[in-house]
């Protein structure tokens, strides 16, 4: 499935990191708190302003971003991996 977001929507692939407990034990995904970090894989053209012009997007493909825990709609890519489709306003920060 090729997702092309509309308006001010962004498609983000969530970054999954393996985590260890303080004792050095690897925690399975179900025991970890989900990181709200991801990489932007697609962006829409921008938000329409009241005068009809398009406000360009701040984020671009390849940016690493931080977003809210309940942000966006989860969908799956062709390989079955989760993606999040969210508004640019749901992105809290660009991580460098």
Curated annotation (Swiss-Prot):
The keyword Transcription does not apply. Keywords: Chaperone, Cytoplasm. It is found in: Cytoplasm. Gene3D superfamilies: GroES chaperonin. It comes from the Bacteria. Pfam families: Cpn10 (PF00166). CDD domains: cpn10. One of its GO terms (biological process) is chaperone cofactor-dependent protein refolding. SUPFAM superfamilies: GroES-like. One of its GO terms (cellular component) is cytoplasm. Its main location: cytoplasm. One of its GO terms (molecular function) is unfolded protein binding. Heptamer of 7 subunits arranged in a ring. Interacts with the chaperonin GroEL. Together with the chaperonin GroEL, plays an essential role in assisting protein folding. The GroEL-GroES system forms a nano-cage that allows encapsulation of the non-native substrate proteins and provides a physical environment optimized to promote and accelerate protein folding. GroES binds to the apical surface of the GroEL ring, thereby capping the opening of the GroEL channel. Belongs to the GroES chaperonin family. This is Co-chaperonin GroES. It comes from Hydrogenovibrio crunogenus (strain DSM 25203 / XCL-2) (Thiomicrospira crunogena). The gene is groES.
